[in-house]
Amino acid sequence: EYPQLGGDYEVIHHTQLLQHLVDEGKLVPVTPVEGIITYHDPCYLGRHNKIYTPPREIIGKVPGLRNEEMHRHKERGFCCGAGGARMWMEERIGKRINNERVDEALSLNPDIVSTACPFCLVMLTDSVNGKKNDGVAKESIQVVDVAQLLLDSVRTPLDPAGETETETAPEPEPVK
């Protein structure tokens, strides 16, 4: 409907923009993020829009990460459970979809489960937290968006005095 209102915009996913900025050298991952990572393909990004490469390329550029693919990935990916408003429903029988997906991720013993969708992030985090509470998942496992991984890697490491090596930006003036 935007063209009908005079807008002609190319819409891209944030992972496509971030991959472009990394490829152009405008964002340079330098700080290692150590560990095994597994990436969950969001339904709309992957199977609906056929975008599989940018998130994996970003992960591949972050030093220290070793990517392990889940059994069901890319075109054969499995939903996180948020689709169709199931995010707000309680299962009456069987296993919650997000728990099924997290069990698949945990079988790889990852340090990080990553995705590129805020709904997937909520569903995967909910399940991982439940697994931690039950003692099934290690306490150190994290669920993060690919953008957060990149941010953690482009930040300059702390110097021994505990300050970043880059100058800090001045605080903005409050709006009056």
Regions found by a protein language model. Name each.
Residues E1-K176:
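Iron-sulfur cluster-binding electron-transfer modules in prokaryotic oxidoreductases
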